Amino acid sequence: MQKLIILLLVAAVLMSTQALFQEKRRKEKIDLLSKRKTDAEKQHKRLCPDYTDPCSNAYECCSWNCHNGHCTG
């Protein structure tokens, strides 16, 4: 009987440890996606000039389709 209780306790500890590692991996994936988004925004700011853009989505209007401060694409 004691062996069964010990086995159940060990199983519970292993399951909770696995859940903790899964949560850690999930957070790491979220952090990586957030970093990629931040890197993309930094690249956009580097490639795209600061100007008042009449376009509805200023993120799409970058230096290669910008003419005299207005989006052409």
From Swiss-Prot:
It is found in: Secreted. GO terms for cellular component: extracellular region. Residues 20-44 form a propeptide. The keyword Signal applies. Keywords: Cleavage on pair of basic residues, Disulfide bond, Ion channel impairing toxin, Knottin, Secreted, Signal, Toxin. Residues 1-19 form the signal peptide. Disulfide bonds join 48-62, 55-66, 61-71. The presence of a 'disulfide through disulfide knot' structurally defines this protein as a knottin. The cysteine framework is VI/VII (C-C-CC-C-C). Inhibits voltage-gated ion channels. This is Conotoxin Vc6.17. It comes from Conus victoriae.
